[in-house]
């Protein structure tokens, strides 16, 4: 990634703030390495997709160091067991970490990829993930700001408008253009698939 020193510093500050910003959804831990690369552990696997989309939204919403260029992130979600945990994510190991790594190898030109231990789940999600990725990649900064509030806090349109200083009508119009309804269906189906498998494996 070609970023100036000021942009990297600004991006680093944002990444370090992610656990706090994402806390309304669930607890997360982050490790940052190689400048703007990072790994995030999510304590509730059914919320992994929602968190990934929220991360892309907040990055796309920000102007780093005042630069007008819109940045994004390439994210690979790995769902699985954790075999070995330490205080640092960089030295922890397990199925989830390995699947996330494999996802990054397979992501190609896309910016979102999901790998699970279940082939039928992967097969179902691959097409919908490509469509969702295309939608998110088109979000403008203003759309991204509103989508972040919706994804993380699920606030009403009026509340989002009050937080961001825009009218409820503008929020409604923006959510429609950003295809919030389709994103919500995608997230709902992901949660159902992961919950079905994890509940079955716990029995």
Language-model segment annotations:
Residues 1-203:
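Regulatory and interdomain segments flanking nucleotide-handling catalytic cores
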